Amino acid sequence: MAVINKAGNVIALLLVKLQLILLFTLSVSGELPQLDYGSLSASLEEDAIDPLTAMAPFANSLVTEESAQHKNNAELLGNSSEDENVRPQQGSSSSGLGSSGAAGGSGILLEEFNSGKLSPGEASNTLPIFLIEPESVFVVKNRPAVLKCKASHSLQVIFKCSGSSQPPPSTHETHVDPHTGVNMEEVTATIHRDLVDEFFGDGPFKCECHAWSSRGVVKSQAATVHIAYIRKSFNQSPTSLRLELGSRAELRCEPPGGFPEPKLTWHKNNAVITADSEPGITVSAGTLIFRQVALQHMANYSCSAENIAGRRVSDSAVLIVYVNGGWSTWSPWRECKCAGKPSQGRKRSRTCNNPMPLNGGAQCPGPQIQKSADCAACPEDTQIVSPDGFDISSSKRMARWSAWSDWSICSAECIQVRRRKCLTQGQTQISSEAEEAGDLLLGAPGVGMAALIAAAGVGAVGSPSEATGSSSDIIPGYGKSLCAGKDIQTAECRGEQCQIGKDDFDWTLYLGLAFITAVCFAFGTALICCARRGIRTNPHYNMARSVMDADYMPGVVEKKEMRMHIEASNMGYDYVNPGHRYLPGEHIMGMGIGCGGVTEHHYDVPNLSANYTNPIDHLSVDYLSETGESSTADTSNSTFDMNGKLSILNASKSSTYEMLGSAGGQLRLYGGELLLFVPEHAIGKHVKKHVSLLLLSDECSRVSCATESSILCSSVVHSAPRNYSFVKPVILKIPHCLVAPEQWHVHIYHADSEHDELSVNWRRAVSVGEETINTPMFVQLEATHVFIMTEQLGHFTVVAEPRIQQPSIKMKLLAFSQHTPPSNANCSLRIYVVKDFPNSRDICANVEAKLGGSFLGESQVFAFTLNSRNLNIRVRSADVEAAAPYEHAIPYQHILSNNSILHCEFSLRRQDQNSLCVDFGQGSEDDYYTFNIPAHSMSGSAEELASTTNTTISIDRQGNYVNESCVMDFVQLPHATKRLICGALDPPRADERDWRLLAKKLNTDRYIAYFATKASPTEQILNLWECRANSSPGSSSNSVSHTIMALLLTLKEMGRQDVLDIIVETIGPLWI
């Protein structure tokens, strides 16, 4: 029987555990009914458990509390009833808890647990006890709120918030008390503002903590989460006041809206105002009260509002305390005394210093000086005339002269006139300034009246009332008899004011200037003639060292040979010369790899003077070797003896300069390929500037590129003046050698240096496509040219980096021949490989001119592909097919070394009857290019190079063209027309049919923000359009008319008929 009872007890215990597991599962899923846990715990604590009725209490509880569960599920968190019943009721008194509810029971259990009165067995059978409950908090936009909850005897603790079935982001921690073995759960929830904003239920957003154990679930008190904010603007800011000393004042401030209510604080000069720091100031809610303002209260006052969301400070209010002036006591009477006269009468004075006027306070009323009726008047030379008149007692009126008027204009008789008036005055006293001036001058005899009048500030011209003020009047019946002396003075005109008998033209001055000019011109001419004569007296300056007489160079018996075997070394000679300009290291380039047994021709370069006017035909050249092979050389480091600094403007054809003013102008080189456009009014009014434009060869400037893949793709351009900031951007047009510019990263390099400086500091000014609002330049990149808009001139060049594999650049070949005697069977042919720059031919021609060479011809421009392949050059006879060609390969790396005058040399047999063909290319022979050298070019006669035309175009103020030869070869809108167009297109429109659409139509809108930063965006766009539309000097007027017509069509497409009418009306039908 005992065994049966024991088995029954075990089964009952198992059923109880299964029931607890079921209850825990239901509670987690949200379907747990609100049970009477006190009755449940009392039933479980009975001494005897009937195995057949062990489930009865649970069944009864489930049935009786089902309706309560539905009722509680219908209520949402955040309602007022929820705050009253936040814990389940516990009804049995046998559990050790009172029947008053969960709040009281939990409080008793917490006290017993903390005091240690609760045994471990009793603790294991209790509901969870909250040690930390969440409290109401505020959440800010950028700072979330944190809620904490901690409970003992719990298996799990989570937060549940309004309007959400999922708990907020939380972190959980579990602890076990080492003394009691009680499990403790702690959870920290992070509440972001987004979660609060998403709640649209009734009442505020609330969160509560739920703790579960084997006995059931307990809810903590609800914590309210509010959104804290503070607005930016104050509802009322303090206003500035100007008050008299001792008056009462109030400053009012109403803080901006916010939650929680912002706390208001007053500040004086940014220091917080407290009752201790400012005893005379009372601070109340939003009001700052001054019982009696004092001078120490003058300050800047502001108020600040602060809450958990932030802090706001109002605008400052200035409190100005002014002081009205007060008179001091009268001084003792003293005698009236004038210089050289006995004393007569008395006077006394007082001072406006009790107190002195401060901060704009009123001056003291009334006179400063009192005089007796018989006070002696000083002579005329020390009389004082003031705007207030003279001080006269009320019993007697006295007359005084006013100040003299200004001298009149010279009459036809060369006479000037000035006048004065006899004035009288009533009760008005003399001003303090005039009296003080009179006191100072009493003892100074001989002081003129004009000085005293100037000190008193009397007007010179006007009626007596205007001179003396409103209180002055002229006594009826009295005239000039009251005043001694005359009222008019006349004088003869002085200086150059009188033009009687003088001619309009001063011949003496102009004859003197003409004489001085003639003397200076004669002196300058004599100096130039002497300088040229000194150069010609020594013919050895124009001779090579190899042809000088042995007597002139004693000790030099024979000239040493200078040979270099290309197979032995690939480095070229780096001739050292003190006058030669070079950059160490980077300018030394490797030579081309030639055939076996090949020697390179080197020349004894003649000593050249700095003056290039001497005939080049007198130069003598010796060959050091004669072979039938070819070689390559880098002539950028040739040993030209340029003693001193060679002026680029004198030594190069690639330069032009002009004195320009506000009318603007253009400077052109190489037929307009290189252009500097100075718009109208880019130079200040009444200012003229020496503007120059020149190309620098590679000898003069080398650009250190940032990366190995960077290529110098334009000539180095120097423009001046470099230290002048133009009023408007000028435009520089530079040709480049890029094929398909969109395949390259293009950069503009700039250096603020003179053209003859040895050390040039280059910097990257603009990277096309990477401009910012602070970029000082605008770059318009086109297929063949780059247009740069800038306000600062200096050195400019274009550097590019490839975007794709194997891009191409434009290059060409130039052929030159060495002058040799007709008896010589061999002739020398040098072929230069250069980039397609405008001055490439001039650079090579200058080198050849010094070596005695002549120009034979050039190839067409070809695309050199960056594919690491060498450039093969082959020279053959055009008439004899069987003749073996001369062939040479120039290494790929030598071509890309940024060296514009790399060349190879061929030594050929002279055959006057045969022409030559030069084949060149990188790939197979099918892709070779060919150009011919006529037979007569090899005969030895030098071909004159085509002269380079440098054009300077100037425009007058009305937009007319000054140079008649260039009247219609470029586009230029008159200034008046351009001004009207800018007035119509500069104002922005909602439909954007303004300067922005014009830039888009003219394809200049790549970086439109540059134009937006200028005073007139339309003017800059039109200036760039004019520069792009400029044609070469030889073009006809039809192309100019077509350009203007294209602009009219553009404006018509924009729908701006008003702008089109402006052009037609101001320019006329000439353009149309």
UniProtKB/Swiss-Prot annotation:
Describe its membrane topology: Single-pass type I membrane protein
Keyword Membrane belongs to the record: yes
Q: Where in the cell is it found?
A: Membrane
| This protein's record includes keyword Nucleus | no
Task: Spell out the disulfide connections.
Answer: 149-207, 253-303, 336-375, 338-378, 352-364
Q: Which PROSITE patterns match?
A: DEATH_DOMAIN, IG_LIKE, TSP1, ZU5
Tell me, which GO biological process terms does this entry list? axon guidance; glial cell migration; motor neuron axon guidance; positive regulation of cell migration; salivary gland boundary specification
Residue ranges of the TM segments: 441-461
- Entry GO terms, CC: membrane
User: Where would I find the TSP type-1 domain in this sequence?
Assistant: 324-379, 398-499
| Tissues/organs with expression | Prior to gastrulation, it is strongly expressed in the presumptive mesoderm. Mesodermal expression begins to fade during stages 13-14, persisting only in the cells that form the dorsal vessel. Expressed within the CNS from late stage 13, shortly after the first axons have extended. Detected in several dispersed clusters of cells within the CNS, increasing in number as development proceeds. Also expressed in the peripheral and exit glia, which migrate laterally out of the CNS between stages 14 and 17.
Q: Domain ZU5, which positions?
A: 654-802
Major place of localization?
membrane
Q: So which stretches are on the Cytoplasmic side?
A: 462-1072
CDD domains to which the protein is assigned, alphabetical: Death_UNC5-like
| Function noted in UniProt | Receptor for netrin required for motor axon guidance. Mediates both short- and long-range axon motor repulsion in the developing nervous system upon ligand binding. Also involved in glial migration. While short-range repulsion requires both fra and unc-5, long-range repulsion only requires unc-5.
Please report the name of this protein according to its UniProt entry.
Answer: Netrin receptor unc-5
Source species of the chain: Drosophila melanogaster
